[in-house]
Amino acid sequence: MGNKTTGDIDRNSFDFLSIIGKGGFGKVWRVRYKQNCQEFAMKEMSKAKIIEKNSVSSILGERDILAQIHHPFIINMIFSFQDEDNLYLVTNLFTGGDLRYHMNKEQSFSENETKFFMGCLILGLEVLHTNNIIHRDIKPENLVLDYKGYLKITDFGIAKKQEKQNSNETSGTPGYMAPEVMNFQNHTVAVDYFAMGVICYELMMGVRPYVGESRNEIKEKILARQIVIKSHEIPSGWSKDAADFINNLIQRKPSSRLGFKGINQIKQHKWFNHFSWKDLYNMRIESPYIPSYEDNFDSNYCEREDNISQQEQELLNKIKSSEQYKTIFKNFLFFNMYDERSNSQKTFINPHKKYEEKQAYSSPQKLKSTIPQLSDEAKETNKFNLFSPRNNKIKHHI
């Protein structure tokens, strides 16, 4: 394995503690940064495999978006770098597992728990949309919990800057994909609100509003009728305001959807009356759901060996000898968005700056002044998890 990098950061800057995930491009490691013992998650991705699977734009797109955004309710990139063989993307380490894992485990959530999760998601989406970014793949697998139960948005592999003409952009996950995307229509950030409504519906009702065996079957069901939660269908312990919130998010017609005129429509919905967005941003609201570490990580899954055929190995070797291989990732280096050595656009707009208080979450300082010291989360037991392999929580673009 190569170990040559550009800049002051490389693979040898870290202690590799354990594998916490695997995917088509490589491994996800729990690592310790030697400079200050901070623990992070590191994606180690084969450059040749990325090229082989035509995923260069996905990987570079995710890196570029994470280079611009830094916020407490999304996964934050700390470093990105490369050597001769691999790309490395270092992010926060979240140990609570993804929302899908917990949905499978708990089967149902209370209204209070759901409102808290939606509040976290709304703040995360607000910062993305303020910076003109559509996530396009909001689903439980892409929402992870930290050890205190705060929800964070992850996986920006198919996220895009919003454009007026984007009808050809049809990536996403059936069941959470907005109808305008499925119908090859131009779309806005409102597609993320539709997905949020589907998740909220699922947390309330235990199933998605539109279910099918294929993308076409789901599309046909969406086109057939508008799903509405009726009063007599509201589960015990849930309010009519919660049902109204969901019903307005899952509107098939974008212009009728809650949030179409701006995210303040969502934040000001009656379900969030008396909800303090400032307290949530400053993490003064305690999560009503605290994840358990006991069974959300399958070490056996991560220990399985990768089997590469001779034919595939020959193809990978051919890719490595190509001119494209030498130049296509040339701007991958990143320290943090305020470091002059990073290839990033320093145009980040934080719509929640008005919420910031002394000692609250703040933007990172230059790397030379060191990353914050070892967090309480990093001091926890060895039961860490960024993804949940037991529930197929391995990113398709790793």
Task: Please give the residue ranges for each predicted region.
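Conserved short submotifs of the Hanks-type protein kinase catalytic core
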Residues: 85-98, 102
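Conserved N-lobe beta3->alphaC-helix segment of eukaryotic protein kinase catalytic domains
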Residues: 39, 44-70
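Activation segment signature within eukaryotic-like protein kinase domains
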Residues: 117-118
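Protein kinase glycine-rich loop
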Residues: 17-28
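C-terminal regulatory tails of eukaryotic serine/threonine kinases
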Residues: 260-352
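A short, aromatic-enriched beta-strand patch in the conserved N-lobe beta-sheet
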Residues: 79-80
